């Protein structure tokens, strides 16, 4: 079978977004270094404050050893100041992502997010990870294509490499990086060290209705549109030579395909075909509004 997957993160990033990616990596590197120092500083602060508090709450030592008590107080304050300074540095190291959009584009993006919110509630969503063409005669089937699929989740969320105020549509990926749909770009995220940024103009998201021969339980939000058999004749009738031949429901699913000129290739099956179609229509409306600049 042939894998259905995107190219590596080194290849996917759009030409015009390489500098933005570099800044994100730089900011993340600085944050990681500060986080390491901050953990050490927080531990030192806890120890210093606990020691000072024991002396302060006691009666004898702070009166008998006044100089030592003063030193403990100063040490506790110093560790608190160091921790606060590192937290400030951590905040400043974050690269805030603010994308200015015309009112029409912003409204279209919000409508697309609403459509995605409905899509994510589909009973089942699968990532198509492998495919092959069927030999319809040898396999005695009416299906043109055989796929391997794995269940994934869609949700609205945030990715740790992007500092933004909004939640972006998030598409899980069973054999590659997760996808986040932001107003100005698509983020393909494997890890904080491996991610790509794709310009919206280079990505195409399409919808196709798929008649799927479902051998598992039929999702509650799907429509059964036909019936077939495990083994069939050329005319679609059941092949009576097979004693244990059984009936298979043909279910209407929505197929989402994401392609880019830089090598993105992702494909999903959604049990709620109507929600999938409405999402892609809302996405197309957003792209049109974003390109018009109105």
Task: Annotate each predicted stretch with a short phrase.
Residues 1-294:
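A composition-biased, non-transmembrane "mature-region" signal
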């Amino acid at each position: 079978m042939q894998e259905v997957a995107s190219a590596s993160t080194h290849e996917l990033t759009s030409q015009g977004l390489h500098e933005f990616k570099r800044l994100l990596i730089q900011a993340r590197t600085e944050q990681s270094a500060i986080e390491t120092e901050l953990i050490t500083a927080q531990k030192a602060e806890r120890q210093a404050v606990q020691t000072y508090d024991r002396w302060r709450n006691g009666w004898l030592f702070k009166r008998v050893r006044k100089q030592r008590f003063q030193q403990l107080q100063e040490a506790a304050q110093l560790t608190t100041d160091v921790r606060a300074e590192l937290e400030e540095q951590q905040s400043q190291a974050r690269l805030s992502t603010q994308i200015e959009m015309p009112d029409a584009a912003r409204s279209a993006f919000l409508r697309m997010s609403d459509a995605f919110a409905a899509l994510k509630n589909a009973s089942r969503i699968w990532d198509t990870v492998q495919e092959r063409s069927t030999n319809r005669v040898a396999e005695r089937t009416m299906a043109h294509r055989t796929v391997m699929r794995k269940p994934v989740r869609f949700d609205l969320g945030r990715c740790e490499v992007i500092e933004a105020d909004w939640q972006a549509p998030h598409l899980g990926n069973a054999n590659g990086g997760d996808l986040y749909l932001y107003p100005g770009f698509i983020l393909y995220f494997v890890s904080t060290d491996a991610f790509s940024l794709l310009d919206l103009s280079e990505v195409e998201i399409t919808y196709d209705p798929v008649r799927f021969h479902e051998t598992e339980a039929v999702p509650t939000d799907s429509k059964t549109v036909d019936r077939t058999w495990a083994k069939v004749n050329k005319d679609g009738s059941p092949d009576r030579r097979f004693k244990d031949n059984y009936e298979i429901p043909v279910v209407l699913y929505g197929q989402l395909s994401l392609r880019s000129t830089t090598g993105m290739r992702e494909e999903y099956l959604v049990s709620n075909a109507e929600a999938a179609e409405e999402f892609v229509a809302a996405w197309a409306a957003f792209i049109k509004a974003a390109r018009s600049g109105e």
